[in-house]
Every structure is written in C-alpha cells, then in structure tokens.
C-alpha cells in the first residue's frame, strides 16, 4: 500500500478524534441498551443464528416467520420518561462541550451571563469594544438638537387605469428610489433578524435605528455622498441592550434627542443621543414578579408624557415617563398576545388592538369593566369594548390614519382590511374595503405590519414578493418598491416621503 495522502491522514485523524469523543460519552453502550429495551436484536447475532440453523439437520416442522417489528422505537413514542442515560439531544457544538468536562463550568457561566438582562443605566461606549467614547458622542450629537412633535402587479394595473390628478401626483411623490451609495447587503444594522425599525425625525441628516430578535440595537448614520475611499463601510453603531426581541423603537414625544426602546424581556430603556447613555426606564412585571414582554407602545396624543403599552400576554397599561416606576395597573384586553395596537388621533381615549385571538377590537380606555365575560381570567379588570371584528386568522397589525378616520389591519389570512371608524361604531365592525395581499410570513421572517404615515392618509406594508407596497386610505396603490429580500419591518419618516424596511438577516432597504 502506498503512502497516505494529506487528505487521507486528515480523515483518519478526524475518525480517531470522533471515536475518542464517542467513547467518552459511552454512546456504544447506550446504543446497545436502547436496542435491548426496544426489543430489536443485533443483526450480527441474527446472521450467526441463521448460519447455525442451516448447518443442523432438517427441521421436521417449518417455523412461521416472526412478525415484522420496527427497527427502532424512541422512548418518546413509547410514552416513557427519559432517565438521563439516553443519547443526548444536542447539536455538534454542545456535543464537543460535553466531551470537554474540564471547561464545562466556565462555558455554563458564560452562557448564563449572555442570558442575563442588562440592568440599570449604562454608557453605550462601555458596551461597544470598538468605539472610542468621544468619537461615539460626536457621531450622534447632530441628532440631539432636533425638535419634533408628535401590489405585485402595480405597474400593469397603473397602465390600465386612469388616475385622478390627485392620485397621479401622489404616485409621482412616492415613486421612491433605493439608496445606492452602499448596497443593501453592506448595510447590516443587527446580527439577527430585524424585529423593529425606526426612522428618526431629523431632516438635515438621516438616522435609521433597528432592533433584532436577540436584543441588539443598530444605529445607522446614513451617508448622503459617495465616499472617497472605495473600502469605506456604512457608519453603523451596534449595541446589545436586551436579551430578547426588540418590540418597538420611538423617540420621546417631547424630545427627539432621546430614543425609547422596549423588549420582550420586559425592559423599557432610553438612549440619549447627546451623551450616548442608556437609562433603564421601566421593568414591566406581573403580580408574581415575572417579566412581562412589551409588544408595543405609543405616546398618548392628549399627554405626550404618558405612554400606552401592550404585552405578549394580552395586558394593557399606561405609564408616565417623568415618574419612577411604582405599582403598574394592568388591564386585560386579550387572553392571548397583543401584537399591535394604535391610538385613535381623533379620539385619543380609544385604542385598537390586533391579537393572536383572531380579533380586532376597539376599546374605550375611560371605562372600566371589572369582570369581563369574554376572559377566562377572573382576577383581571378590563376596558369597555366599543367594536369588534372577528378575523379568520390572527390579526398582526392595526394602524389609524392621521386625518380621515380610517383604520387598517392585516393578518395571516393574506388580506388588508380598511375600516371607516368615523361617527358611532357598530358592535360588529365590518371593513369598507378588503385587499388581497401577500403578507403571511413563516418562522424566518418577521411579521408584516401595515403602518400609516404620521402626516398623511397613506400606509405602507412589506410584501412577501420582496417589495414595499404603498396605498392610500381608500385602498388605491401608489407604489411598489422592489427589494432583493423581504423588507418585513418597515418605518416611515414622520414628515418626509422616506421609508425603510429591515429584513431577516439584519439588513436595511432605504427608499428616498
């Protein structure tokens, strides 16, 4: 036999290393034990028995063939509990860690530290190894002094229809172009799937903030001119502030130099763009002191210091951001997750909620119902229901138009529904218009949510056919902005015709 090649030597080393690891884990004995418990005999023993039987004298009576049995039956399928001696259900990295018993305590300590929520007030420069504190402050100071108060076949249909002059003008206004100074695959704001986006209200310079499913927050200082250096990268600052999904990002209604971000880990934190400090505003907990994931929040139109919030378990509460958190008064609006809510700008005491319980409900927050009949929870008060729409599948998003009293919702039934909410509402709410739309996501794409622009009766929603679609409140499509991937989580600039969408790999598509 000739000399082994380098590839063959490497392969033998891998086989030896894997065998050593399997010996440490004692998997051979475990495998034999599972076979015995499942009633499966070893194939080698079967062959030996057959050979021995063949060499003996002819049998007088032919034995019937045994009934076929499954080659393997797991304990889970047999309804048995795992006793700790079975083959561990782990991935390759975890398997290697198990084989390195001397380093397990340290690895466990690191994993525990990664899952520990960030508590108290912090400097972002302390969390970002690659950033100098002075450079970090200079980068965002320009955003700290701004005052701000609170269709897949589009082209084909456009050619067949004769729009009104008003619609034609809107279509021209929203014929937006994709930002091209950097390619979208270079604009990576977060490490994981984007779950929240926000367009800062500054007009002189653009700032886009995104949060992801791992609790990371990325701030993109958008460059307006071509860089002199071809190797220059987008100006993105990344920091990990939470341990779970970032559910919502906004600015304070009274101070746009302060950002506010909420997470599924129950934390509400601010980011001051002037000094780049992050302050812990609130940790939302239930009566058992367990964190309540914050799914959505919005500042009240009547009082810009009061925050309305909803939770992953169906509660609703209000909080004055000027005060220190004390006892939180929770009201139950659903027995399941509230994924989205919106405050009616014409009647700020009314809110609409979209829930996993397949309903859109409108509530009067001035009125309390101590024992709601619809809830299975006896100890929770609620608010009074004004109107309800029952959907075939869960309702993902709700959003009020700023001026003409239209409410939009979308969900997993691949529709966008528009409701007229002016005047007195019937208990059984029915849409004025239903649009078919490709908006049902899978597990790898964030939920698509229709969002009205703050200063116009125009809303946008991502399309699973890789685009952002823009509509009027009467359902007329104004634009179909194609993208390379699904820009699932969108955000409008509050005053300009700019929109941004974030995808499942942490990247952003900006249209201006």
Swiss-Prot record:
Membership in a protein family: Belongs to the WD repeat DDB2/WDR76 family.
PROSITE patterns reported in the protein's UniProt record: WD_REPEATS_1, WD_REPEATS_2
Gene Ontology terms, MF aspect: DNA binding
Compositionally biased residues, Basic and acidic residues: 34-46
Amino acid composition bias (Basic residues), ranges on this chain: 47-60
Protein name, as recorded: DNA damage-binding protein CMR1
Domain of life per record: Eukaryota
Region listing for Disordered, in residue ranges: 32-96
């Amino acid at each position: 036999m000739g000399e082994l090649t380098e590839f063959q030597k490497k392969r033998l080393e891998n086989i030896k290393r894997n065998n050593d690891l399997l010996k440490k884990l004692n998997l051979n004995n475990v495998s034999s034990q599972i076979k015995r418990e499942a009633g499966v005999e070893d194939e080698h023993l079967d062959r030996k028995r057959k050979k021995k039987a063949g060499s003996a004298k002819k049998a007088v009576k032919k034995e019937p063939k045994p009934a076929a049995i499954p080659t393997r039956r797991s304990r889970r399928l047999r309804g048995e509990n795992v006793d700790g001696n079975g083959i561990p259900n782990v991935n390759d990295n975890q398997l290697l860690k198990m084989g390195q018993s001397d380093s397990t305590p340290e690895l466990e300590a690191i994993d525990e530290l990664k899952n520990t929520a960030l508590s108290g007030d912090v400097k972002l420069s302390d969390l970002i190894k690659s950033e100098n504190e002075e450079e970090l402050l200079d980068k965002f100071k320009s955003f700290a002094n701004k005052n701000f108060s609170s269709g897949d076949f589009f082209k084909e249909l456009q050619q067949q229809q004769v729009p009104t002059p008003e619609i034609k003008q809107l279509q021209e206004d929203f014929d937006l172009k994709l930002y091209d100074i950097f390619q979208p695959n270079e604009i990576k704001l977060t490490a994981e799937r984007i779950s929240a986006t926000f367009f800062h209200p500054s007009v002189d310079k653009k700032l886009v903030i995104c949060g992801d499913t791992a609790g990371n927050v990325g701030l993109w200082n958008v460059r307006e001119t071509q860089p002199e250096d071809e190797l220059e990268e987008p100006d993105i600052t990344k920091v990990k502030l939470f341990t779970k999904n970032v559910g919502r990002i906004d600015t304070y209604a009274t101070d746009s130099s302060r950002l506010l971000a909420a997470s599924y880990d129950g934390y509400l934190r601010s980011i001051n763009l002037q000094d780049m400090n992050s302050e812990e505003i609130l940790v939302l907990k239930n009566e058992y002191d367990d964190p309540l994931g914050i799914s959505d929040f919005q500042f009240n139109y009547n009082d810009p210091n009061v925050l309305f919030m909803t939770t992953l378990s169906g509660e609703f509460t209000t909080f004055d951001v000027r005060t220190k958190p004390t006892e939180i008064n929770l009201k139950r609006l659903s027995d399941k997750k509230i994924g989205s809510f919106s405050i009616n700008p014409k009647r700020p005491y009314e809110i609409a909620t979209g829930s996993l319980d397949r309903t859109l409900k409108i509530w009067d927050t001035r009125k309390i119902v101590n024992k709601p009949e619809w809830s299975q929870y006896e100890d929770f008060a609620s608010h009074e229901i004004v109107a309800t729409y029952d959907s075939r599948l869960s309702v993902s998003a709700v959003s009020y138009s700023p001026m003409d009293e239209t409410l939009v919702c979308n969900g997993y039934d691949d529709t966008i529904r528009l409701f007229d909410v002016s005047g007195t509402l019937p208990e059984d709410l029915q849409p004025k218009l239903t649009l078919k739309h490709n908006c049902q996501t899978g597990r790898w794409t964030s939920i698509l949510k229709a969002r009205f622009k703050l200063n116009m009766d125009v809303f946008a929603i991502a399309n699973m056919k890789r685009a952002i679609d823009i509509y009027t409140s009467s359902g007329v499509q104004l634009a179909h902005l194609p993208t390379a991937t699904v820009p699932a989580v969108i955000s409008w600039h509050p005053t300009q015709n700019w929109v941004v969408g974030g995808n499942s790999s942490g990247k952003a598509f900006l249209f201006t």
